[in-house]
């Protein structure tokens, strides 16, 4: 082997070793206790190198280290790069930490990036009920009605967990409450599936009431028969039967129609400018 080839191979090996140490340092795996991120980058660690399924930027978001996220971006980390799971750093940040989300968005992260299952960062923020991340993403142009592989929206993801805070914010931004996924499920039927498992709390009950106000009228029955899992809870079944049997009133149907006509914008601001009495504005905003 020529000396020049040996030198090139040694250089590549050294850089790879530094990059692996960078990942370990960010993740606080102290194989090298005296390592720090800035020194490793200065020494030649590649901020875009993938180790296994991980990239440094994604790893920093996983441990909610906003300072490290900003440092990596300053040093050239690709903000929309995909890791081994076809996820961007923003997918990880959206689940965990608003500060990381804000830094990534400032550096040009795509709020509508899709992972391997067509999930957006907003889907994950809503599912984890990270309300401030939900708000930050929506303010930065995230699609409130983005569809995953099953045609579920972020509202569906929030509803299936009974995440009241996230559901409320999504509805404020005009989320479509009557969306139906490929299995025929709606956000409210997703929430009912949680309630029938006996896992409902006061917050989940409040989430149901909010979704019910937003949708106006809904139907869970098929050919007049409630799903078998619903019938196992007699009290809940009776309540849902009454609600499903009640036709939507002109008032509730008008509320849904007006909210939808206002389009995809922050509805509290849009409603505020309407020439309506305060009581009607509150009604449109699902406050009563």
Swiss-Prot record:
SMART domains referenced in this protein's UniProt entry, alphabetically: ANK, SOCS_box
Residue list for modification Phosphoserine: 17
Pathway: Protein modification; protein ubiquitination
CDD domains: SOCS_ASB8 (cd03727)
Keyword Repeat: yes
Domain SOCS box: 235-288
Location relative to the cell: Cytoplasm
Maturation and modification: Phosphorylated by TBK1.
Principal cellular location given in the protein's record: cytoplasm
Keyword Thylakoid: no
Gene3D superfamilies associated with the record: Ankyrin repeat-containing domain (1.25.40.20), SOCS box (1.10.750.20)
Keywords: ANK repeat, Cytoplasm, Phosphoprotein, Repeat, Ubl conjugation pathway
Pfam families found in the cross-reference section: Ank_2 (PF12796), Ank_4 (PF13637), SOCS_box (PF07525)
GO biological processes: intracellular signal transduction; protein ubiquitination
Function summary: May be a substrate-recognition component of a SCF-like ECS (Elongin-Cullin-SOCS-box protein) E3 ubiquitin-protein ligase complex which mediates the ubiquitination and subsequent proteasomal degradation of target proteins. Inhibits IFN-beta production through the IRF3 signaling pathway by targeting TBK1 via 'Lys-48'-linked ubiquitination, leading to its proteasomal degradation.
Domain commentary: The SOCS box domain mediates the interaction with the Elongin BC complex, an adapter module in different E3 ubiquitin-protein ligase complexes.
Family per record: Belongs to the ankyrin SOCS box (ASB) family.
Protein name: Ankyrin repeat and SOCS box protein 8
Organism: Mus musculus
Gene: Asb8
